[in-house]
């Protein structure tokens, strides 16, 4: 099990990311718009830099929903490889069967 503080920190980052997503997208669009004056674009860069660092999508780490494990997490199931294997062998994941050929 991962530390509870690490899992909670990641959840906080997810909340901040959802909250700031619109503002970030708006500022990034202004920055990329070549039709604007360079001064206006630079002001958008400064405003983007003032937003909280944890509001960026790249700060969120994929973690296992059951254990909080940060490595080898399957995006489709949001489970780590160990829990995925355990649940699949118990038949608790619909449609997943052990491969045989």
UniProtKB/Swiss-Prot annotation:
A family per Pfam: Ribosomal_S14
Highest taxon listed in the record's lineage: Bacteria
SUPFAM superfamilies in UniProt: Glucocorticoid receptor-like (DNA-binding domain) (SSF57716)
Keyword field contains Ribonucleoprotein: yes
Single GO MF annotation: rRNA binding
Region Disordered, annotated ranges: 1-20
Keywords for this protein: Ribonucleoprotein, Ribosomal protein, RNA-binding, rRNA-binding
Gene Ontology, cellular component aspect: cytoplasm; small ribosomal subunit
An example Gene Ontology biological process: translation
Record-linked InterPro entries: Ribosomal_uS14 (IPR001209), Ribosomal_uS14_bac/plastid (IPR023036)
Assigned protein family: Belongs to the universal ribosomal protein uS14 family.
Oligomer status and interactors: Part of the 30S ribosomal subunit. Contacts proteins S3 and S10.
Function: Binds 16S rRNA, required for the assembly of 30S particles and may also be responsible for determining the conformation of the 16S rRNA at the A site.
Protein name per Swiss-Prot or TrEMBL: Small ribosomal subunit protein uS14
Organism (species): Rhodospirillum rubrum (strain ATCC 11170 / ATH 1.1.1 / DSM 467 / LMG 4362 / NCIMB 8255 / S1)
